[in-house]
Amino acid sequence: MRLWQQYLALIAAVLLPWAAMTAAASSPIVIAHRGASGYVPEHTLAAKAMAHAMGADYIEQDVVLTGDGIPIVLHDIHLESTTDVAARFPDRARRDGRFYAIDFTLAEIRTLRAHERTGADGNAAFPGRFPLGPGPLTVPTLAEEIDFISGMDRSRGRRTGLYIEFKAPNFHRREGHDIARRVLDVLVEKGYDQRRNQVFLQCFDDATLRYLRDTLQTPLPLIQLIADNSWGEDSDVDYDFLQTAAGLDAVASYADGIGPWLMQIYRGKQADGSVELSSLVALAHERGLQVHPYTFRADQLPAGIDSFAELLDI
């Protein structure tokens, strides 16, 4: 059976198993990874507007906190890769040379201008995408983005979901902030805290997901993201263990699904051209877990895959 017959293909983001479909669904569910980030600078409201206009079913929000505890939509705990913070606040870097969002108030972050992602050398990380340079784009708060998406839903007659990741919860805890509680506070304020069919919450840290389920008692579906142990995530999780039957038994006790790296599922092609897959998906489904692999990108195809269409068709 082809992979697309086991899951719903999600363009540039994740896959959902058939069990996650509504009875009326008959086409792939699209989750926009950082918005339409291949066309417009990631996580800006412009990227989210374009994703909405392109028909995304879910739009992703990576969330970090400001120094005054406000959830903002930003992929990194640092600001310099996607904003002009170094030019506006040159004296605010820590000893490691990085500019941390947690060291700035929301008022200060509102003065920044967002741009296409850059590398350590200051050059575009993805040449050929949106050009670098000054512009009007800014860093939105989570509350602002929810209002923005809700407004577009109303004007366009749609119902778009949120796919929220808690970034670096242990870092935030060491800085004296409870990112899980602050994000849930925003969802309560905006009336999204009970929308089980419209919100997913994801995190690489199992303790944070257990806290969300057991202490904060959120009814929203939780996704345990699975990294590679070599990546150095700020968590005590053994991601190799999570890919075993025993590890998935543990995940099933607090989460509704897993978000594995695509290469933890796709193992390459055999000599006859057939696709080799790991047992991870089957093991997860045996335990009633949804599977949301990341990330399907036309500009970063796995070895042996010649086109994005082929990637979706494995």
What are these regions (language model features)?
Residues 1-11:
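Bacterial N-terminal signal peptides that target proteins for export
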Residues 9-19:
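Bacterial N-terminal signal peptides
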Residues 21-314:
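Phosphate-group recognition and catalysis centered on beta-loop-alpha active-site segments
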